[in-house]
Amino acid sequence: MYPVRVEINLKTDFTDFTPENFGAYITVNEEGYKKNGTFVKLPSVMDAWGYGGVVVYISLNGYDAYDMACPNCALHGKQTSCAIDGFYAVCPDCGEKYDLASGTAAPQKGLVRETLRRLRIMPSGDKLTITQQQ
């Protein structure tokens, strides 16, 4: 399991990232923070973004967070990060699609049964902290 520790400041960096904005997302990896695909800022020294990067998505349930590594490719020894395409995280290697909008990240093509790895998301004041599940 790869460590995850990401903090999102809703007051300064992501003021419009609210539960009312269904389908909005933030990704975090070594390239930085992106909101809906647009670069926002560099990651801090304290950030750790799991195996394939982190996506925080506003689903029907509110805020959800997942590691973007494709479970199907990981079973075959590949480290492939999914790309966000609307309501789905899509693996560019195997083509599996994971449903983000429902809040389950369940695979849609049936190549694998495993969902994207869910991460813990803790709102506190104006911040969201994302870590791995215990």
Each PLM stretch: what is its role?
Residues 71, 91-92:
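Cys/His/Pro-rich metal-binding microdomains
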Residues 84-88:
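Short secondary-structure subsegments characteristic of cysteine-rich extracellular domains
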Residues 76, 97-100:
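Secreted/processed peptides and extracellular or luminal domains of membrane proteins
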